Amino acid sequence: MPALVLLGAQWGDEGKGKATDLLGGSVDYVVRYQGGNNAGHTVVVGDQKYALHLLPSGILSPGCTPVIGNGVVVDPSVLFSELSGLNERGVDTSKLLISGNAHIITPYNVTVDKVTERFLGKRKIGTTGRGIGPTYADKINRVGIRVQDLYDESILTQKVEAALDVKNQMLTKLYNRRAIATGQVVEELLGYADKLAPYVADTVLVLNQALDDDKVVLFEGGQGTLLDIDHGTYPFVTSSNPTAGGACTGAGVGPTKISRVIGILKAYTTRVGAGPFPTELFDEDGEALRRIGGERGVTTGRDRRCGWFDAVIARYATRVNGLTDFFLTKLDVLTGWEQIPVCVAYEIDGKRVEELPYSQSDFHHAKPVYETLPGWSEDITKAKSFSDLPKNAQAYVKALEEMSGAPISAIGVGPGRDETIEINSFL
């Protein structure tokens, strides 16, 4: 049976939670493979709305085993807050598995993240301030704390001491902050050990055995392709690999096991935080997209920057991820526009460019080249098949498909679980 990767094909916030939830009833495992509680997924089930930051969206599907892989960074306080909130609403969270090799976001990681952004001022990246970047930095510098370290106090103490030797120098001498005591951090982290224990597992072994047993495994990326540390709009990126290759390293599953890679595309474009955004709108259209689309970050609460659909970015996502399908979301938000511009290329220094610029400088100077497509006024939220859509909406979808380089196999026409048109089965 297949292993599928589902990821954002833009700058995140594309509606991955809706897509994962749709597939959750048909898969056996849903796996987060990177990121942390800097991601935000909103899932609507009936009249219930769930905002998830760290937990896989599949936790809302009763027959599914949710997994937090080794590539994820885990803030235990956020984890237990989310679990408690779901339990209070009657959601069974007992099947959750967490990799013992996942790294822990420590209190000093959060502190460093916040004071660094404050210190940088106008030069800041616009992080969520949740300690994600510093935790990944510790991982690369080999001073990170892993989940399994919570079960050996001696090793945990040594690792915290080693990390704070450097962190406290930075906090006291550069940022004029108080030093953080090793004992205080160790005590707090050890306090999570017993609560975490029922969930900790060798998830690499579990997932590979599941695939050998013909189970269906869905790998769920956080953020989006253009926020990838290697393939995104660096330095305005996240600290991990949301792209398809990250599923292999972040979950411990070989690339030959993956059969489909599904990119989630919003029918327009949004971005949170700093960085280039060629199709960004600063007029009433941008404000209307933000208002109608409810474009406010689930994690940050910040208003999202909004713009028209960018086919250059979509083609890039197809290439770097090897996308086999697209899931187009929020098509309903565009209802009411008489004309809908779509960016088909950029103009850079007077030249037309149809692929994403290699140079950061060029991307900053890219101006969108638009083609205008006719809009529609009919309500599409009740559409159950592609033929139910107005002709102009059908033409819009077909145009995006042709420009983006992979078939659009599903379309979101509203926030609800049942407000989806499935054109081709993902399984």
From Swiss-Prot:
GO terms for molecular function: adenylosuccinate synthase activity; GTP binding; magnesium ion binding. Its cofactor is Mg(2+). Mg(2+) binds at residues 13, 40. Keywords: Cytoplasm, GTP-binding, Ligase, Magnesium, Metal-binding, Nucleotide-binding, Purine biosynthesis. The active site is at 13 (proton acceptor), 41 (proton donor). Its EC number is 6.3.4.4. GTP binds at residues 12-18, 40-42, 304, 330-332, 412-414. It comes from the Bacteria. GO terms for cellular component: cytoplasm. IMP binds at residues 13-16, 38-41, 128, 142, 223, 238, 302. It is found in: Cytoplasm. Its main location: cytoplasm. InterPro entries: Adenylosuccin_syn_GTP-bd, Adenylosuccin_syn_Lys_AS, Adenylosuccinate_synth_dom1, Adenylosuccinate_synth_dom2, Adenylosuccinate_synth_dom3, Adenylosuccinate_synthetase, P-loop_NTPase. Substrate binds at residues 298-304. Homodimer. PANTHER family: ADENYLOSUCCINATE SYNTHETASE. Plays an important role in the de novo pathway of purine nucleotide biosynthesis. Catalyzes the first committed step in the biosynthesis of AMP from IMP. This is Adenylosuccinate synthetase. It comes from Streptomyces coelicolor (strain ATCC BAA-471 / A3(2) / M145). The lineage of its organism: Bacteria, Bacillati, Actinomycetota, Actinomycetes, Kitasatosporales.
